[in-house]
Amino acid sequence: MLDAFAKVVAQADARGEFLSNTQLDALSSMVAEGNKRLDVVNKINSNASAIVTNSARALFAEQPQLIQPGGNAYTSRRMAACLRDMEIVLRYVSYAMIAGDSSVLDDRCLNGLRETYQALGTPGSSVSVAVQKMKEASVALANDLTGITQGDCSALIAELGSYFDRAAVSVV
């Protein structure tokens, strides 16, 4: 965002002019959009533990074999690893959301994740379901406009959903 401000200022300075009303309006819109983005990420971050825990509970209710003897989330060590991985995905989705770009999610979280899970024998389809459940919870929080900067958030919510979809697809 600072790059956009610096670019507009540099352009006006090169022309020896004040910023135009059009430029100021565009920058103001960008700030308002950034505030909404921050509000959405803050809601996710503030509720991260509940998002992960409730999504895991819902996954295990649907797929109880995961927590039975021999299941991939059986034993407290494996359960902790599952919850940790879910939290990592949620964290990187929040990074992508704040940046407005999936590259941090792709580069630092998703690239190679499918292969890692395959090597560990972790069912990618179950991980994908867990990610979708976190998406549902996060989108529901984002749709609650309490504490969100006024304005249409539909594009941001769609963007948020797309990051979860990207993560869900990458593990199967």
From Swiss-Prot:
(2R,3E)-phycocyanobilin 2 binds at C153. The modification N4-methylasparagine is found at N72. It is a peripheral membrane protein. Contains two covalently linked bilin chromophores. It comes from the Eukaryota. GO terms for cellular component: chloroplast thylakoid membrane; phycobilisome. Keywords: Antenna complex, Bile pigment, Chloroplast, Chromophore, Electron transport, Membrane, Methylation, Photosynthesis, Phycobilisome, Plastid, Thylakoid, Transport. Pfam families: Phycobilisome. (2R,3E)-phycocyanobilin 1 binds at C82. Its main location: plastid. It is found in: Plastid, Chloroplast thylakoid membrane. GO terms for biological process: photosynthesis. Light-harvesting photosynthetic bile pigment-protein from the phycobiliprotein complex (phycobilisome, PBS). Phycocyanin is the major phycobiliprotein in the PBS rod. Belongs to the phycobiliprotein family. Heterodimer of an alpha and a beta subunit, which further assembles into trimers and the trimers into hexamers. The basic functional unit of phycobiliproteins is a ring-shaped hexamer formed from two back-to-back trimers contacting via the alpha chain subunits. The trimers are composed of alpha/beta subunit heterodimers arranged around a three-fold axis of symmetry. The phycoerythrins also contain a gamma subunit which is located in the center of the hexamer. NCBIfam families: phycocy_beta. This is C-phycocyanin beta chain.
